[in-house]
């Protein structure tokens, strides 16, 4: 009889991470994976093509829960996920990262005494005002298997008294980047024709976090910083526009150094990232992906959970004027994190 894993995701970055593990799960004939999409972030780019390109199945369940307060969203997700878990009766629940979907999946499973596996466990920004930080901490403290991307994440858990079920497996975003690079190589003409650009003459910029966009003054400070940065370094700014900031960018549309783009697919983002001179972002994931492509990053936040990128000199906070001396390698693994995770899951099921 096959063992059953329920995977809970709610945002595009979580699908990218889950895809790496789903591709490994498919190699096991005795494991069945069922995917729940909470709907936390609706993304029009997540069509059938999105799942085909990532080589993963479409979600069996779509809860369509989004666009409400953190508490309302998490509460609705708890109820919706519980209904699915009662029906599917999984042997283990797999959650990713630090979204409301992560926390809701972990809490629902914990209350039903279903084992929980948390991918990207142990990360800490130590900023309790970030909703993601609360989600990370609470999820870790109810999880049974904690898959850490870094040794620092393992140390963070130990400092909180969590030592059982902790595994240092490397960063599965490294797995995802290897997969993306192979995909881009096979479809290179498509990307070259789509983007008329010269390598190195632009910076890739993204802003999407609520703390960056809810306050117009903060957003304007970030845009002013980016403008000065581009002028100082003689770089264009390629800026895919998140739906949250469409109104905020109107007064910048006539600025010659900003090139506003429609939202990009995952593979389009990876292609532009590989050609950029710099990355400016408030995204945690893009900080790492910049490193995987060996592109210097400036994080548009006052802290980051990926402290290795700061210590290694590949990343710096926008409030700091200089990088640390650059080291060639960060211990994020070699792209086999998903394989290690599924082997551990298989042995525990």
Please place each PLM-identified region on the residue numbering:
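Leloir-type glycosyltransferase catalytic cores
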Residues: 51, 152, 316-349
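A donor-sugar binding/catalytic signature common to diverse glycosyltransferases
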Residues: 95-96, 146, 270-309
């Amino acid at each position: 009889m096959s063992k059953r894993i329920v995977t809970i995701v709610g945002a595009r970055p979580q699908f990218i991470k889950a895809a790496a593990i789903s591709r490994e799960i498919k190699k096991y004939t005795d494991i069945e994976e069922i995917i729940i999409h909470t709907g936390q972030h609706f993304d029009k780019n997540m069509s059938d093509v999105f799942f085909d390109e990532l080589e993963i199945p479409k979600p069996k369940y779509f809860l369509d829960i989004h666009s409400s307060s953190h508490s309302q969203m998490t509460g609705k997700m708890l109820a919706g996920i519980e209904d699915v878990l009662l029906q599917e009766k999984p042997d283990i629940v797999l959650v990713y990262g630090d979204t409301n979907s992560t926390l809701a999946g972990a809490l629902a499973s914990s209350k039903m005494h279903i084992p929980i596996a948390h991918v990207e466990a142990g990360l800490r920004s130590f900023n309790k005002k970030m909703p993601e930080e609360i989600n990370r901490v609470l999820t870790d403290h109810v999880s049974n298997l904690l898959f850490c991307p870094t040794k620092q994440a393992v140390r963070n858990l130990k400092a909180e008294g969590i030592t059982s079920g902790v595994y240092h497996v490397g960063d599965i975003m490294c797995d995802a980047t290897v997969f993306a690079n192979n995909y881009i190589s096979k479809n290179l003409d498509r990307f070259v024709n789509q983007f008329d650009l010269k390598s190195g003459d632009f910076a890739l910029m993204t802003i999407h976090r609520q703390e960056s966009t809810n306050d117009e003054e903060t957003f304007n400070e970030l845009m002013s910083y980016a403008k000065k940065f581009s002028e100082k370094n003689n770089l264009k700014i390629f800026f895919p526009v998140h739906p949250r900031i469409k109104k905020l960018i109107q007064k910048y549309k006539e600025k010659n150094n900003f090139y506003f783009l429609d939202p990009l697919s995952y593979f389009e983002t990876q292609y532009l990232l590989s050609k950029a001179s710099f990355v400016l972002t408030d995204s945690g994931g893009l900080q790492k992906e910049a490193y995987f492509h060996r592109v210097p990053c400036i994080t548009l936040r006052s802290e980051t959970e990926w402290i290795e990128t700061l210590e290694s000199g590949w990343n710096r906070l926008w409030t700091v004027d200089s990088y640390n001396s650059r080291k060639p390698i960060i211990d994020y693994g070699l792209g086999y994190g998903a394989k290690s995770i599924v082997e551990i899951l298989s042995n525990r099921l």
